[in-house]
């Protein structure tokens, strides 16, 4: 009887799609109003001058200028700002 025993099933073998989070425009880069600066979960980066925050905590430029990253305050929070020319 040259039969093969049936292979068992597995509970593994799936994964979620990557969400493409992270910094999209780096320090010193020129941006236009509406450009996305950072995609994040929660406020790893906080909104500084000329930067808005979306309902999913995405940071975006509200005016034209250059991107600046700063660490401020006693809690060493990271702020993203857009410096207008």
From Swiss-Prot:
Biological processes annotated in GO: translation
Region (Disordered): 1-22
One Pfam match: Ribosomal_L27
Keyword Ribonucleoprotein in record: yes
Transmembrane regions: none
Keywords assigned: Ribonucleoprotein, Ribosomal protein
Cellular component GO terms held in the UniProt record: cytosolic large ribosomal subunit
Any one GO molecular function term: structural constituent of ribosome
Keyword Ribosomal protein: yes
Family of this protein: Belongs to the bacterial ribosomal protein bL27 family.
PANTHER family assigned: LARGE RIBOSOMAL SUBUNIT PROTEIN BL27M, RIBOSOMAL PROTEIN L27
Record NCBIfam families: L27
Protein name (database record): Large ribosomal subunit protein bL27
Lineage start: Bacteria, Pseudomonadati, Pseudomonadota, Gammaproteobacteria, Alteromonadales
């Amino acid at each position: 009887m040259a039969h093969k025993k049936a292979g068992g099933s597995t509970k593994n073998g799936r994964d979620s799609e990557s969400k493409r989070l992270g910094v999209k425009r780096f320090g010193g880069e020129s941006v236009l109003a509406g450009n996305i600066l950072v995609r994040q979960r929660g406020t790893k980066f906080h909104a500084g001058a000329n930067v808005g925050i979306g309902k999913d905590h995405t940071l975006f430029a509200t005016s034209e200028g250059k991107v600046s990253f700063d660490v401020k305050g006693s809690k060493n929070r990271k702020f993203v700002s857009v410096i207008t020319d």
